[in-house]
């Protein structure tokens, strides 16, 4: 856990989005991710609770609670807090092959399951995910992945 008292010290901060009437004028990014300092504060809010429901992805009575991809949310929040973006990206990429998409379109079920959200506002997990992947592309440690080394065992065909 990055900062044991972070959830008490910092308020939730969400990334802003460009207004729809402005969005339609161009094809630019309209989710403006948080600054590194704000991401660090939001990561500090992660309590690293004993049972991280945010990453559980459980289906109860036909409804999903937590991340269905089982993203290692407390782990990459801790890495964000310490400023280790490359390791945070590696942790994120372990369970999520397309964080560049999910950070934009995911309904953030992890935030609904966040323990911190039971007594206040949940951690801005989706915004942190967005920040991790954008930083990874900007700093050059994320990019196209080649899967040509994988082999389909039954057909002996290469992917």
Label the model's feature ranges.
Residues 158:
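Cationic, low-complexity basic patches in intrinsically disordered or flexible, solvent-exposed regions
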Residues 1-15:
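N-terminal pre-domain segments of enzymes
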Residues 40, 44, 48-56, 62-146:
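Glycine/serine-rich phosphate-binding loop and adjoining beta1-alpha1 elements at the start
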Residues 31, 35-36:
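Electrostatic cytochrome c docking/interface patches
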Residues 12-30:
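Short, contiguous pre-domain boundary segments
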Residues 2-5, 22, 153:
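Alpha-helical structural elements
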Residues 148-155:
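Conserved small/polar residues in nucleotide/adenosyl-binding loops
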